[in-house]
Amino acid sequence: GIKFIGPTAEAMRKMGDKATARKTMIENDVPVTPGTGIVKTVEEVQDFANEVGYPIILKATAGGGGKGMRICRSDEEVELNMELCQSEAKNFFGNPDVYAEKYLENPRHIEVQILGDSFGNVVHLGERDCSIQRRHQKLLEEAPSPAINEETRKQMGAAAVRAAKAINYEGAGTCEFLLDHDGKWYFMEMNTRIQVEHCVTHLKSFL
């Protein structure tokens, strides 16, 4: 017979919806930024923002590539951006659902490459630092990251493995994390595919 090489449709669905991905990570002790589930009203977002403090960011649950995201620094900006973000989400991804997160100012963007087999084994191949970006699009990738120490490297790698095992992941994938100025790091999303940036990891790992 024919076997598809890569993650199952269920694994891709779980990580493709960012609100579901956040919930899955919380259940598996992977740190995430303070955030919400799917929000429908301006008032829900404002209540969350006033609880955690501005700035916050609105994100499309089905989003990617820097689309369907709006940073809000006040209640007024939530009113201005909520409908725009939902409209962008529907136009770009066919799904108007959005959620809110605490926005980290100028974080480092660290991603960890993982590989899983069909027997439940998962390994990570270290991290790439893709903090140099323009309009949320990566311009330069570096491995290993110059911004993290060995302890953080081990913790991020272990979290990426936990994330992959939580969804019975098969094949190559990437867990993306944000690193703040205090050295705290948070899961952002998982790309359920091999990325073009894998060549950077290949040069380091030969895999």
For each predicted feature, which ranges?
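N-terminal beta-alpha lobe that positions the nucleotide/phosphoryl donor
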Residues: 1-175, 179-204
